[in-house]
Amino acid sequence: MLAPGLLGALSSGAQALQPPTGVVVLTVGGRVRNTNDGRRAQFDMPMLEGLPQHSTVTRTPGFAQARRFTGPLLRDVLAAAGAQGTLLRLVALNDYQVDMPYDDAQRHDVIVARLLDDKPMAVRDKGPLFVIYPFDARPELRSAVYYSRSAWQLRTIEVL
């Protein structure tokens, strides 16, 4: 369920995503139906905070100790954008790109983390958004394939 006011109905059956009022931190483009910028869905931090929040405590290759990551599930972000596809291209602030099967967002509780140990993440700390799989909860995810899909400094998701 989306936060009240996040979406407004359009006569075409698509949904209009409310426009961001703050700095855009995430753009979802490609095969999306719910837009607020022509053909893209743009999110500011309050919009992401308005989605249901989830946490996972897990280790990653970048952190030796288990850390707590909190944010909306990737599948909820995609649902807010009305995304439908087979592949997600994740693009970071430094232009790092990695492809993730769309199904990963549905099968795993992948989080678009906005908090690290309950604090907002600065760019120098891999923020402001970090795609995190529940590595410690699902041992089969502890592999180079899934680690490479955990893009930090996420800025764009292209739905293909």
Task: Give the residues covered by each predicted segment.
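N-terminal export leaders
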Residues: M1-L2, L6
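N-terminal signal peptide c-region/cleavage motif recognized by signal peptidases
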Residues: A9-S11
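N-terminal intrinsically disordered, low-complexity segments enriched in P/E/S/T
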Residues: G13-L160
